[in-house]
């Protein structure tokens, strides 16, 4: 009987892991899922189009067929932890795993890929997720929904920023996200203020933080003016957001709209809202993550975005609220800064 039990246990382990090569493990969906934590490095090697249609939460997308695949992986992932890789069926990721193993990575490739994962009914998302940790060790996830819409997950809380359902690809907030503990709205333009989305996210305890105009339009909420501060489960400060270019001043008049600085256990996040490179940005201190808009004529040019980033000096810059603006040259213009180009058109 003891030999039988030992054999069953060995067979089960082989079902989760079957090694191929020194640093490559081909792993079942169950084994892959069991290994995932919020800190697990996960690489999706499918095309950008496949990734946007649906992917594993927290995965980073680097196309196996792009010429600089290995260099891009090296820039995104260290070799100090195992890397979990998948594609549609497991074939591309198997090839990628072999290649990365030769570069010194320990790689786990999911057998059957995304198809096998979804056949089991496991969770997927259409949105990229950026992960951070506060100075006190609390994990923070920022879900990059689209355009100016974000979800910040911190300490079991859901903080929605400028939720909008119908812009671009429809977002079904009622089914894709939990009810929000906090909803932050920067101003009343349609691509930032959507009462239907707010209604889908609202629960009895939800706190809405916005400018005065949106509070009036919604009929509820905590209105903050530029310079106001509030303390909830996190600290928040409303900061100026406005246009400075002649001919654009009417889009976002000074004093009406908000940007926000959130402090989560010491981690400081700047959400700029719709603004140009205004002088008040030089007063922002110790920003860890900055979301800066970059599209004309309503917000900043690439040159203005560079200037704004140079004033703020965030550790991480994530441009957002951009349309057809070409941001490909932005990282080279900000040497030494972690610039992350994501799907936030």
Q: Language-model segments: what does each one mean?
A:
Residues 2-5, 17-38, 48-82, 91-128:
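Rhodanese-like catalytic fold shared by cysteine-dependent sulfurtransferases
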Residues 20, 126-155, 333-336, 345:
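Zn-dependent metallo-beta-lactamase
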Residues 45-50, 146-148, 209-217, 225-226, ...:
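Short, polar loop motifs at secondary-structure junctions
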Residues 47, 245-311:
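Active-site-proximal loop/helix segments of hydrolase catalytic cores
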Residues 85-87, 180-191:
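Metallo-beta-lactamase
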Residues 132-135, 149-185, 195-199, 245-250, ...:
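Pre-active-site segment of Zn-dependent metallo-hydrolases
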Residues 166-169, 189-193, 215-218, 228-230, ...:
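Active-site environment of divalent metal-dependent phosphoester hydrolases
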Residues 219-232, 254, 306, 310-345:
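Binuclear metal-ion centers of metallo-dependent hydrolases, dominated by the metallo-beta-lactamase
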């Amino acid at each position: 009987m003891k030999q039988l039990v030992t054999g069953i246990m060995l067979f089960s382990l082989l079902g989760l892991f079957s090694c191929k090569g020194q640093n490559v493990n081909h792993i079942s969906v169950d084994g892959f899922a069991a290994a995932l934590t919020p800190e697990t490095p996960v690489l999706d090697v499918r095309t950008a189009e496949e990734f946007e249609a649906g992917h594993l939460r927290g995965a980073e997308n680097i196309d196996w067929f792009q010429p600089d695949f290995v260099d891009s992986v090296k820039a995104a992932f260290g070799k100090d932890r195992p890397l979990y890789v998948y594609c549609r069926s497991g074939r591309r990721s198997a090839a990628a795993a072999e290649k990365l193993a030769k570069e010194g990575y320990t790689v786990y490739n999911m057998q059957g890929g995304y198809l096998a994962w979804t056949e089991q009914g496991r969770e997927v998302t259409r949105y990229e997720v950026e992960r951070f940790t506060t100075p006190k060790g609390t994990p923070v996830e920022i879900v990059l929904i689209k355009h100016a819409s974000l979800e910040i997950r911190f300490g079991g809380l859901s903080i929605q920023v400028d939720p909008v359902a119908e812009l671009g690809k429809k977002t079904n907030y009622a089914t894709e996200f939990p009810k929000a503990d906090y909803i932050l709205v920067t101003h009343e333009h349609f691509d930032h203020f959507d009462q239907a989305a707010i209604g889908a996210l609202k629960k009895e305890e939800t706190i809405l933080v916005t400018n005065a105009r949106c509070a009036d339009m919604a009929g509820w909420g905590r209105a903050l003016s530029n310079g106001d501060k509030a303390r909830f489960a996190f600290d928040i400060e409303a900061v100026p957001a406005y246009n400075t270019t002649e001919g654009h001043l009417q889009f976002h008049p000074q004093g009406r709209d908000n940007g926000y600085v959130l402090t989560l256990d010491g981690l400081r996040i700047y959400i700029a809202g719709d603004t140009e490179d205004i002088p008040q940005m030089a007063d922002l201190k110790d920003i860890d993550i900055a979301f800066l808009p970059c599209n004309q004529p309503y917000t900043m040019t690439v040159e203005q975005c560079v200037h704004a980033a140079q004033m703020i000096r965030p550790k991480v810059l994530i441009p957002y609220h951009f349309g057809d603006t070409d941001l490909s040259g932005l990282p080279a213009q900000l040497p030494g800064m972690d610039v992350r180009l994501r799907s936030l058109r």
